[in-house]
Amino acid sequence: NLWQFGMMIQHTTRENPLFKYFSYGCYCGWGGGGPLDATDRCCFVHDCCYG
């Protein structure tokens, strides 16, 4: 779920995902378009699975 995804990001990057990634790229937060980089692709995959 979204909470677990956020905790995984926080554990891996040591960053607060809400502030760091909410409006990042095309897929982190309210997304659309094509992934910009590896981080944005991770959000894209999450959207495909849980969106």
Curated annotation (Swiss-Prot):
InterPro entries: PLipase_A2, PLipase_A2_dom, PLipase_A2_dom_sf, PLipase_A2_His_AS
Lineage, top ranks: Eukaryota, Metazoa, Chordata, Craniata, Vertebrata
Keywords: Calcium, Disulfide bond, Hemostasis impairing toxin, Hydrolase, Lipid degradation, Lipid metabolism, Metal-binding, Secreted, Toxin
Co-factor: note: Binds 1 Ca(2+) ion.
Disulfide pairings: C28-C43
Localization (cell): Secreted
Catalytic activity: a 1,2-diacyl-sn-glycero-3-phosphocholine + H2O = a 1-acyl-sn-glycero-3-phosphocholine + a fatty acid + H(+)
GO biological process, alphabetically ordered: arachidonate secretion; lipid catabolic process; phospholipid metabolic process
Tissue and organ expression note: Expressed by the venom gland.
Entry annotation: catalytic residues: H46
GO molecular function: calcium ion binding; calcium-dependent phospholipase A2 activity; phospholipid binding; toxin activity
EC assignment: 3.1.1.4
Origin: domain of life: Eukaryota
Full protein name: Basic phospholipase A2 Bfon11
Record family assignment: Belongs to the phospholipase A2 family. Group II subfamily. D49 sub-subfamily.
EC supergroup of this enzyme: hydrolase
Cofactor: Ca(2+)
PANTHER family assigned: PHOSPHOLIPASE A2, PHOSPHOLIPASE A2 FAMILY MEMBER
Role description: Snake venom phospholipase A2 (PLA2) that impairs hemostasis. PLA2 catalyzes the calcium-dependent hydrolysis of the 2-acyl groups in 3-sn-phosphoglycerides.
Residues reported in the UniProt entry to bind Ca(2+): Y27, G29, G31, D47
GO cellular component, one term: extracellular region
Pfam family, one: Phospholip_A2_1
